[in-house]
């Protein structure tokens, strides 16, 4: 059994604790406490240990992040959410650069990633350059980005908690990554795609309505991209 599967089982057990014990459990987990007496304390200690192990595992793996896998995830999502827009159902070349977009995040790569599905030659290609132009002018906060390992670990921990609640796959919510007070929130899975496609990138929020306007990502010599934030006030996601 993997650490993620064990964490899911522990989360399931925690759901059945009495309220007082459940509150103790959540308090211990939030503060990283170990060795608290009682069943709730033991569960919390196990949860903290498993989370630490997952984070360590992902930190070790982070150097092998696959840009190709991230690109394929964008294409797969384009198939799912942009069913009638066949000109997004693959990668395409524009001015010698490779483009990917699903409507929520988009990337322009200086060098093409091999082995990706391609948009049919007969279809009119989307010109991403004008779409990225407003974001290139972003002059808001430079966002502090997580490492690939940190983000992967956070996603695994979040997903284990979602599965523990026995939700159907379509009802599970993605991890929301919060950059800070008065700063954008984003879909953690989409953020991971950009970090793997644009290693070492910087990210700049818009100074005007950062909760609505695209975040601009740039990695010198690799490419650039944008990510649409999540609408905070309604709880509705744009991504």
Predicted regions and their residues:
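Short, charge/polar-rich alpha-helical segments
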Residues: 1-13
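Intrinsic-disorder/low-complexity loop/linker signature
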Residues: 31-32, 90, 96, 222
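Intrinsically disordered, low-complexity linker/loop segments enriched in Gly/Pro
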Residues: 52-109
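C-terminal functional regions that serve as terminal interaction/effector modules
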Residues: 102-105, 109-113, 117-239
